[in-house]
Amino acid sequence: MYKVMMLPMAEEDIMNNTDYIAFEKKAPETALELAMGFRNTIAKIEFMPKQHELDEDEELAAREIRKGYYKNYKIYFFIDERSSTVYVLRVLHMLVNAKPLLLNMRL
């Protein structure tokens, strides 16, 4: 089993995504459900993180960035085998071009 660490940007992504649903779309119940769904999906990564595919982008895959899915969102993460830790990097809507955001991160 792996330890899961959320990077600050991933936490901020979850807040931004749920705030948008709650306040812009005026659906606070849906936002709460979304937040809980993100947390549950991320918690499950600790058991078998390698079952998730590497990103289809060659540069991201070369950096061993993997992704999981929840609804219309991708959860990007990196596995550090030395410490048995999964680092959740970003939680982004599928329409967001994640590549520049992920390549600018220090791994």
Where are these regions (language model features)?
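Basic, Lys/Arg-enriched alpha-helical interface segments
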Residues: 1-64
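Enriched for short, Lys/Arg-rich terminal
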Residues: 70-107
